[in-house]
């Protein structure tokens, strides 16, 4: 198929069909499966090829104390899709955890990873995994690693962006696309955020920065604060997203405020045929933190002072685990104009496997420029790459 059609909003439809305020939507998979199945069925009839299981908020923390296990909820959700939409692919839908990761919050990267891994393990019998509405690149990475390391399913990764073109934590579509492509995602997308016209330029930026299929799931405009209704008609929604389809977006559906009627209108227009001229993917050497990207197409100044070679003070700081000193050196170099910082903690008596990832986290909590991880120890590099937020450069590794 030239296009795959996703479903629309589950929350909007549950509210329209009588879900009481304060209800945890995922519990309805067990307490009112007929209601959930009615939504799935209507999206399938409207033309959806892929239907999302009602698991967006299903995670160990949110379901704690409900009396239902994570596996029970997720398996019921998948069963509801299978029964109501047997001809559609079933996506395990994974949303944010609802907690900020370090350094913005208290949840560690590995703690986030373990929570996502539990969700993936509970839903491995879905046809694919969708990680969506993510606002933090670091949390998105934790979710994608969990999906890839705990299943063999294809993974669609979708972030949400604000009016300034950055995510809540400051990531751009370019950084998102380059990082998630490098981590092995199978499809990239943007969802929620705003209406389709707002998403089009952001989607074009994603298209230019990945060779992967790109997905769009916009809102039906903006909500009315008086009654919660959304501003766009189905015809205007389709008209608004059409330029993205013409530019190369091939996976499309709707988020907040969209209904089966929206998907039906979208399916009808796609069925008439769309002339597509995909924005070309720009191959380039690119490194980034979560906030700042550097295209390596010319000479770039790299700060080399985060290296213990012939630096007794730096060696002592490593032995003392004096990360404040490392951070001060990083800050001085960025203020002097370094575009990338080389980081090496290899010295006699130093456990690089432990120290390098910790140094990465400490420095990235303060400095925005990308890092170049410098080590001849593959295990240390692997540990550091795992916790790095963005797409780093790697230096000195032996083949």
Region roles according to the model:
Residues 1-399:
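Domain-level signal for soluble alpha/beta catalytic cores
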């Amino acid at each position: 198929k030239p296009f795959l059609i996703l479903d629309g909003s589950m929350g909007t439809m549950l509210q329209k069909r009588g879900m009481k305020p304060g209800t945890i939507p995922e519990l309805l998979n067990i307490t009112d499966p007929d209601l959930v199945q009615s939504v799935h069925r209507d999206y399938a009839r409207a033309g959806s090829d892929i239907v999302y299981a009602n698991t967006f908020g299903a995670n160990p923390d949110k379901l704690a104390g409900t009396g239902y296990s994570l596996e029970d909820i997720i398996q019921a959700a998948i069963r509801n899709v299978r029964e109501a939409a047997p001809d559609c692919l079933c996506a395990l839908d994974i949303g944010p955890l609802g907690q900020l990761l370090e350094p913005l919050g208290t949840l560690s990267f590995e703690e986030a990873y373990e929570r996502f891994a539990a969700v993936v393990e509970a839903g491995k019998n879905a046809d694919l995994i969708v990680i969506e509405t993510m606002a933090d690149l670091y949390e998105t990475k934790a979710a994608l690693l969990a999906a890839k390391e705990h299943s063999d399913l294809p993974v669609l990764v979708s972030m949400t962006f604000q009016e300034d073109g950055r995510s809540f934590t400051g990531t751009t579509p370019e950084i998102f696309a380059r990082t998630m492509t490098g981590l092995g995602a199978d499809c990239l997308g943007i969802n929620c955020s705003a209406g389709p016209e707002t998403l089009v330029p952001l989607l074009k930026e994603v298209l230019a920065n990945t060779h992967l299929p790109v997905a769009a799931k916009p809102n039906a405009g903006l909500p009315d604060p008086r009654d919660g209704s959304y501003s766009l008609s189905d015809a205007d929604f389709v008209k608004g997203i059409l330029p993205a389809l013409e530019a190369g977006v091939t996976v499309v559906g709707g988020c907040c405020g969209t209904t089966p009627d929206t998907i039906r209108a979208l399916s009808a227009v796609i069925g008439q045929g769309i002339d597509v001229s995909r924005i070309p993917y720009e191959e380039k050497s690119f490194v980034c933190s979560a906030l700042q990207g550097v295209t390596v197409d010319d000479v770039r100044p790299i700060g080399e002072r985060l290296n213990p070679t012939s630096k007794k003070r730096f060696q002592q700081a490593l032995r003392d685990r004096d990360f404040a000193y490392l951070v001060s050196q990083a800050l001085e170099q960025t203020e002097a104009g370094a575009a990338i910082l080389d980081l090496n903690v290899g010295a006699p008596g130093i456990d690089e496997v432990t120290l390098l990832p910790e140094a990465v986290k400490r420095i990235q909590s303060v400095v925005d420029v990308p890092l170049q991880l410098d080590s001849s120890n593959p295990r240390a590099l692997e540990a550091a790459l795992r916790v790095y937020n963005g797409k780093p450069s790697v230096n000195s590794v032996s083949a």
